[in-house]
Amino acid sequence: MELMGMSSTKYGGLEKFNRTLMEKSPQNKFIFVYVEDPMCQQYVDDMTTGNSAIEVISNKSVIRYCFSVICLILKFRPHIVHFHFGDEKMLLAPFIKVFFPWIRQITTFHSECVLHSLKAKIKCGLYCRCQSKIVAVSKGVQKEIAAFYDNKKLVTSYLGVECDVSKNKEEARRILEIPMKPIILTTIGFDVATKGFDVLVDAVAQMVNKFTPPLFIVNVVGLSKARKEQFMGIVREKHVESYFMSMGIRNDINTILSASDIYIQPSRTEAISLAIMEALHHGLPVVASNVGGIPEVVIDGKNGLLVNACDAEGLAMAMLDLMQSPEKRKEMGERSRKHSLNFNVEKGVENLIDIYEKKGVISNKS
């Protein structure tokens, strides 16, 4: 049972990972539990056939959510409960440990895990003690967890991504109705503050006010309608509307990346970025914040440039550097494509199945 602890707004990298996991392990039954109905019908169709099913439990009430999960456990009798997102897992894990001791628990830390208070460290440490295996999505996150829970149960496993790179830039821009001349800088994220989109706006404002960059457009992808309005308000405050476009939540990320020249990830915090992994597969150079697991996917000076989080001036200079040098973009893009081989979805799924089966979490005959 995969307790996602989140909603699914698109057919994104994590959704594709789940589908591949289901396909590569046909001998096992997977129950994916979300807090809202997934928004992409194609994903629902793909995940409700064969050995997979989707259940939806609202998390508006923590107690009701936990009770509903327990009901699902009684209904499906899973061999394993795999926690992903959501604070509710802190309550569920010890309950399952006591009342369903035959169930093996696994947790994946998809976010950075920097705990500042002793209380938070003790709470998270107790949660980790309930787990059979603790999976960090990057070495950076593993290091953060090891600061308060250094244990042999802790491993790093990259998720990896699936990419369709069949479209060339001309075809992709024609489909998206984007002109060929501008340099397209793309960034993908669900939240303005977490993903540092406000810093990106500040960086663009500084760049166009101090320099004369080549013709460019920044394409912001992944914001809901409300967050898109919030973001465009920041853009208007800086008077840089002509340099931005916002496509909202999309399922055609491969086409968008095929149409792009540079990928930007100015996050304040980031365990590791599936969007960057996708950009690497498309041969894009990357400008990103030097936080969390990002340095594992962006090698500074090789396939991209790293800047300090919230450093608008540094971000502006890095973007300008790549925009002014087509040759550097090409060289870094080629290195990105080679580096992307380390972040293949099938490899990530194989690692997780190995954790499930080899470590005795589930039998490959169950």
Give the positions of each predicted feature.
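Glycosyltransferase donor-sugar binding loop
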Residues: 32-40, 161, 188, 215-230
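Nucleotide-activated donor-binding/catalytic signature segment of Leloir-type glycosyltransferases, i.e.
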Residues: 231-248
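Conserved acidic donor-binding segment of nucleotide-sugar-dependent glycosyltransferases
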Residues: 300-301, 305-312, 321-326, 341
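N-terminal strand-loop element at the rim of the active site
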Residues: 4-64, 226-227
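Aromatic "clamp/platform" in nucleotide-sugar-dependent glycosyltransferases that forms part
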Residues: 249, 268
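Short His-centered aromatic/hydrophobic patch
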Residues: 83-91, 109
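Conserved donor-binding/catalytic core segment of Leloir-type glycosyltransferases
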Residues: 1-3, 179-195, 201-204, 219
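Short hydrophobic beta-strand element within catalytic cores of glycosyltransferases
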Residues: 285-288, 298
